Amino acid sequence: MGKFTSFLKRAGNATKRALTSDSAKKMYKLAGKTLQRVVESEVGSAAIDGVMQGAIQSIIQGENLGDSIKQAVILNVAGTLESAPDPLSPGEQLLYNKVSEIEKMEKEDRVIETHNAKIEEKFGKDLLAIRKIVKGEVDAEKLEGNEIKYVEKALSGLLEIGKDQSERITKLYRALQTEEDLRTRDETRMINEYREKFDALKEAIEIEQQATHDEAIQEMLDLSAEVIETASEEVPIFGAGAANVIATTRAIQGGLKLKEIVDKLTGIDLSHLKVADIHPHIIEKAMLRDTVTDKDLAMAIKSKVDVIDEMNVETQHVIDAVLPIVKQEYEKHDNKYHVRIPGALKIHSEHTPKIHIYTTPWDSDSVFMCRAIAPHHQQRSFFIGFDLEIEYVHFEDTSVEGHILHGGAITVEGRGFRQAYTEFMNAAWGMPTTPELHKRKLQRSMGTHPIYMGSMDYAISYEQLVSNAMRLVYDSELQMHCLRGPLKFQRRTLMNALLYGVKIA
């Protein structure tokens, strides 16, 4: 358990001349053209916000517009295609989640329809039957009395698909670590196929880094979406195909509705079982100007294997420790679904393995806190708080609350969220640089519980999340990159740095 505090480092202040200069007017005009093209490109709000942020940074800090847009686009689009919304805007989070859900469902349905026969051959008919039940394509009578059987099939299916993905990517990882002369023909073929995808991704990112005018941004965004779709499956399940029907592990799991049927019949939320399509460490390697060696690429791929294995251990934990409790609840109701069962097994939303966001009742724009909770089997969490008014950050490992999904007793180590929040507020209040008005608002906030603003999923391992948080505490160059522009953009950039990490190019 650890506790760390630090002052954030911010770049220089704005100059009034920049706002009225001829160069600023040109930037406004160019930003307008750029935004029009980006809006028409169907890439989404992440790209729009990225261009907006780039233009604002240029005007405020006197930077070259191309450089600013370059940084913002790499962070928001090339890095993830799932840029985080403003942590203190529940409405923005809701809209973002709804749009993401619609896009995800459309892609999943397309994958299942295209690869239906191959999925049945590889994973069996039972998983496709679960999809039909959730979508209401079979009679409800077929489910009645067989609920536990379908829950078991869904969980074992999740584990089977996850292990299959882990085995495929681990083979690639081991092949990359093997000396070139000692590789088998299959290993050489596997590496060559992945190298083609990686090189295409690298070229797309190089175009983004060179984008200094609006046409390049349009072309680059379209290319990124296409390349990321192809590169997201390092070793294909069923072989390569057209970009719009590539069968990714994530799309197959989602399309089969395995998590949905578990949630529907038991109340157990498994939405945290997520793996990034392309791990941020692979994106980081693709941003390097130099040739990426096999050993470096292997270590980046190992990061994705770590996330997949963490999700598989979590699924196994649910099967071993939680499923027996589910069966006990069903036995109370003659082994049939009852409306009380989900309520008995549900846990508080603030205890789920996500990043939970809070703010203070007063001076809310400047102060926000994140509580990151690890997968249930790890029983860990941490607190990180930011006071942007005085440029202060506080990190602390915290204990977790006991609940039914831990499957038994928990070990309480360290202080809880409330104690960490109180210390963060006290420390910020006691800083000599804290303005008097801000002090008064902090003092008022100390006597109340922080306001809960929602949660965000993370698609990296918990250890990688902790590492990203520690970089925000200690890396002054990263802090200067994050603390630019209006507070809204600073908060979004900090969340992106926490969720995915940032490569300063």
Swiss-Prot record:
Q: What's the chief localization of this chain? A: virion
User: InterPro entries annotated for this entry?
Assistant: Capsid_VP5_Orbivir
Subcellular location field: Virion
The GO molecular function terms of this record are: structural molecule activity
Looking at the record, which segments are called Involved in membrane permeabilization? 1-42
Lineage, top-rank taxon, reads Viruses
Q: Sorted alphabetically, which keywords does the UniProt record give?
A: Capsid protein, Outer capsid protein, Viral penetration into host cytoplasm, Viral penetration via permeabilization of host membrane, Virion, Virus entry into host cell
Provide a GO biological process annotation.
symbiont entry into host cell via permeabilization of host membrane
Asked if the keyword Hydrolase belongs to this entry, the reply reads no
One cellular component (GO) term of this entry? viral outer capsid
Listed Pfam families = Orbi_VP5 (PF00901)
The entry assigns this protein to a family as follows: Belongs to the orbivirus VP5 family.
Please describe what this protein does: VP5 protein is one of the two proteins (with VP2) which constitute the virus particle outer capsid. Acts as a membrane permeabilization protein that mediates release of viral particles from endosomal compartments into the cytoplasm. Permeabilization activity is probably negatively regulated by VP2 and is triggered by endosomal degradation of VP2 and exposure to low pH.
Name it. Outer capsid protein VP5
